[in-house]
C-alpha cells in the first residue's frame, strides 16, 4: 500500500508554487537595509484604543473617513485591508473563477500579482512592457480574452517610472465591460499628481491599490487600501476576512491619516526626494555603474558591471540591496531603497571601492 504524504494531500498548484521572495524572507545580516523600499527610521505613535477585549470593526470608521478625505474620494469608495497585498488577492477572489479566468500583468513588475493568482488557481498571462517600460497595448489587447483583472503598477516597482496616462485611458477603454483594471499606486505619494483617483467616476471598472507602508513609514503596520466604485467595494466586502485590521493597527492608521499625520508624511516625502536626487547624482559618477534610471519613487534602479559580484560585495559589508537580475529586461540591475544620508554614503563609498 502506497504511503500518502502530507504534501501529497496539498493542492497541486500549491505544491508547485514558488512563494514570493520578500525582502525579509531573503534574509541577510546587514545594518544598512535598502532592499524593501521602507522608510529608513521609525515613526512613533501612542496607542489610544484600549478596548482589546472586543473585536474590532471590519472597516474602522475613522480609518475609512480619514483615508477618503486624504484621497479625495467618498468613504463608500474605500476598503481597508492587511496591506495592499490583501487587496491584490481580494480582487482575484472576487472576480476570477479558478480554472477558467485569468489575470494579466506586465513584467518587469511587482511579484505578488502572480503569486496571489497561482495560490488561488487562476491563470496568469504576461505581456512584457516595451523597451521604455511602457505598456504594450497591442500585446495586451491580443491577450485580453478570458482576462478578468489587469494589474498595472504606476509608478512601477522595480523600474520606478510612471505609466503614460494616455495608455491607462486606452487600457480602460479596451477593458470596459470585460475586466477590472487595477492601478497599483503603492508609491503614489512620491508623485501625487499622477494618481488616477479622480478617474473613478469615469471608469466603473477601475480599482486603485494604496498603502501606508512607504511614504507613511508604516511597513510594519500592514495597512493598505483599495479605492473603487461602490459596486466593486461591495463585492470585495463579501470575500474579505471579518476582522482584517486589529484595534491597534486601526488606531495607528487613523492617527497617521490625521491632518498632522498627512503633514508629517509630506515632509518625509520631500526629504526622501531630496536624498534620492543626491544618490542618483553620486551613482552616475561611479565607474561600476553603467546606467541609473529616473525614478518617481523612494528607490533607484541602476545597471551595474558585474552586478552579482557587486551585490555580494555590498551584502558582505552589511549593505543589503535588491537583486533584479532575474526580471525580464533587467539583466545587471540592482534596486536601491533611498535611505538616510549616512546610508547613502555607505552605498556610495562601497561602490566607489569596487574594482571594475
From Swiss-Prot:
E.C. no: 2.6.1.9
Cysteine pairings via disulfide bonds: none
Entries under SUPFAM superfamilies matching the protein: PLP-dependent transferases
Catalytic activity: L-histidinol phosphate + 2-oxoglutarate = 3-(imidazol-4-yl)-2-oxopropyl phosphate + L-glutamate
Cofactor names: pyridoxal 5'-phosphate
UniProt xrefs under PROSITE patterns: AA_TRANSFER_CLASS_2
Subunit-level organization: Homodimer.
GO molecular function: histidinol-phosphate transaminase activity; pyridoxal phosphate binding
Enzyme kind, highest EC tier: transferase
Pfam families: Aminotran_1_2
Taxonomic lineage from the root: Bacteria, Pseudomonadati, Pseudomonadota, Gammaproteobacteria, Enterobacterales
Family, per entry: Belongs to the class-II pyridoxal-phosphate-dependent aminotransferase family. Histidinol-phosphate aminotransferase subfamily.
Pathway named in the protein's UniProt entry: Amino-acid biosynthesis; L-histidine biosynthesis; L-histidine from 5-phospho-alpha-D-ribose 1-diphosphate: step 7/9
Modified residues (N6-(pyridoxal phosphate)lysine): 214
Biological-process GO terms, alphabetical: L-histidine biosynthetic process
InterPro entries tied to this protein: Aminotrans_II_pyridoxalP_BS, Aminotransferase_I/II_large, HisP_aminotrans, PyrdxlP-dep_Trfase, PyrdxlP-dep_Trfase_major, PyrdxlP-dep_Trfase_small
Keywords noted in UniProt: Amino-acid biosynthesis, Aminotransferase, Histidine biosynthesis, Pyridoxal phosphate, Transferase
Protein name, UniProt field: Histidinol-phosphate aminotransferase
